Amino acid sequence: MREANADADPPDEVRIFDTTLRDGEQTPGVALTPEEKLRIARKLDEIGVDTIEAGFAAASEGELKAIRRIAREELDAEVCSMARMVKGDVDAAVEAEADAVHIVVPTSEVHVKKKLRMDREEVLERAREVVEYARDHGLTVEISTEDGTRTELEYLYEVFDACLEAGAERLGYNDTVGVMAPEGMFLAVKKLRERVGEDVILSVHCHDDFGMATANTVAAVRAGARQVHVTVNGIGERAGNAALEEVVVVLEELYGVDTGIRTERLTELSKLVERLTGVRVPPNKAVVGENAFTHESGIHADGILKDESTYEPIPPEKVGHERRFVLGKHVGTSVIRKKLKQMGVDVDDEQLLEILRRLKRLGDRGKRITEADLRAIAEDVLGRPAERDIEVEDFTTVTGKRTIPTASIVVKIDGTRKEAASTGVGPVDATIKALERALKDQGIDFELVEYRAEALTGGTDAITHVDVKLRDPETGDIVHSGSSREDIVVASLEAFIDGINSLMARKRS
């Protein structure tokens, strides 16, 4: 725990209630198949979450079956279904074989009167009945006070008392539209904690409408909350929810709270959810974003090379990430020398400064600088011909509505001409598979770790930037490379070729 946080008095342990498969799936445009839900649930279980809210069983037959499939996996995590104050929702949770039910109890004036068209006494009675019904059916019961942060505490006390009396085991305080500030959250949870006592698990569920979800969740824990609702990557309705990876790392690193999470798996989990939901993780996303441990500035990179703690709060390995140094107009000599050394290129101080000047000129023109650019500049400064193990002479692709995407390619490998062809799910896939086939025949192998394509301009003639991350299966070396073109197939092929040449240059060194 950092000294600045030493006055905090959070609990020693906090339960992690993950709602990626329920609230997270309510992200506009996201619809997970039962198989995709199962894959995420398994990964959540592997990293150590306490509860997986697998969905809302009463929503559809497919949702019920998906929850049942997860429940039958015999995971260590508790499997939970959401429910309204409706006995039929509880029946659906039972049919889905869930361990627990999360009953949502609307409490604010606008929710009770405008949405439910009930009065508060009716809500109390309905909540009490449904909690008792769920308990009678053998379910662990958690209730959440929907829009709790816009509800006066006196009424929340009544709701909590009624639900506890009916058998609820966990009580939730919800910032449903993200209007709470951390100071207010701390005070409210402190009062609720005092009301319900230490034996009851008080939970908190925060939305990110004003960008405060993580801060509010942490404030609630500082005030005594012993369970937090989170989603992977912070996905969810509107602006999303408190992010699992952020909340966990803040609690573990800044407050010394044990979350039970295997943090070294967080980045892996993040990428899985990103891939299956299609919701991109911003590069600057805390903890798991592509740039979370990436350095370009010469001053920062030089500091990192001397002592990693100068510009990193934690080692990237702690969350399963990796440290990267990228080339750009802010780069310094330390990073250039390090990358040239990896390529087996030795330069003196004067040559190093000339390479730096040329790289900065490229950066000033708005170009994304790759290792291939650095290698080409270095070889020019050294006055020797560019070494390219692999060059593309030509390639063609064919695709159509009733045509299987097919590609053929002609490459030169150390001067030897090689032809290959392949099919794929699309022209990019077919082209890269043809390249792989040509290289494997010559004993050259690589693994694709990550592929990203992004339109830089609008229109059908948009410039597309492709980034790839490649690994040498023999040495374990990883390189990043990229290319920008109007043609995504050309951009992809160039990015792969540059990356493979970088791997081979490193291997030679």
From Swiss-Prot:
<dbReference type="Pfam" id="PF08502">
    <property type="entry name" value="LeuA_dimer"/>
</dbReference>
<dbReference type="Pfam" id="PF00682">
    <property type="entry name" value="HMGL-like"/>
</dbReference>
<feature type="domain" description="Pyruvate carboxyltransferase">
    <location>
        <begin position="14"/>
        <end position="267"/>
    </location>
</feature>
<keyword id="KW-0100">Branched-chain amino acid biosynthesis</keyword>
<comment type="subunit">
    <text>Homodimer.</text>
</comment>
<comment type="function">
    <text>Catalyzes the condensation of pyruvate and acetyl-coenzyme A to form (R)-citramalate.</text>
</comment>
<dbReference type="InterPro" id="IPR000891">
    <property type="entry name" value="PYR_CT"/>
</dbReference>
<protein>
    <recommendedName>
        <fullName>Putative (R)-citramalate synthase CimA</fullName>
        <ecNumber>2.3.3.21</ecNumber>
    </recommendedName>
</protein>
<comment type="similarity">
    <text>Belongs to the alpha-IPM synthase/homocitrate synthase family.</text>
</comment>
<dbReference type="GO" id="GO:0009098">
    <property type="term" value="P:L-leucine biosynthetic process"/>
</dbReference>
<dbReference type="GO" id="GO:0009097">
    <property type="term" value="P:isoleucine biosynthetic process"/>
</dbReference>
<dbReference type="InterPro" id="IPR054691">
    <property type="entry name" value="LeuA/HCS_post-cat"/>
</dbReference>
<keyword id="KW-0028">Amino-acid biosynthesis</keyword>
<keyword id="KW-0412">Isoleucine biosynthesis</keyword>
<dbReference type="InterPro" id="IPR024890">
    <property type="entry name" value="Citramalate_synthase_CimA"/>
</dbReference>
<dbReference type="GO" id="GO:0043714">
    <property type="term" value="F:(R)-citramalate synthase activity"/>
</dbReference>
<dbReference type="InterPro" id="IPR013785">
    <property type="entry name" value="Aldolase_TIM"/>
</dbReference>
<dbReference type="InterPro" id="IPR036230">
    <property type="entry name" value="LeuA_allosteric_dom_sf"/>
</dbReference>
<comment type="pathway">
    <text>Amino-acid biosynthesis; L-isoleucine biosynthesis; 2-oxobutanoate from pyruvate: step 1/3.</text>
</comment>
<dbReference type="Pfam" id="PF22617">
    <property type="entry name" value="HCS_D2"/>
</dbReference>
<dbReference type="InterPro" id="IPR002034">
    <property type="entry name" value="AIPM/Hcit_synth_CS"/>
</dbReference>
<dbReference type="InterPro" id="IPR011830">
    <property type="entry name" value="LEU1_arch"/>
</dbReference>
<keyword id="KW-0808">Transferase</keyword>
<dbReference type="InterPro" id="IPR013709">
    <property type="entry name" value="2-isopropylmalate_synth_dimer"/>
</dbReference>
<dbReference type="GO" id="GO:0003852">
    <property type="term" value="F:2-isopropylmalate synthase activity"/>
</dbReference>
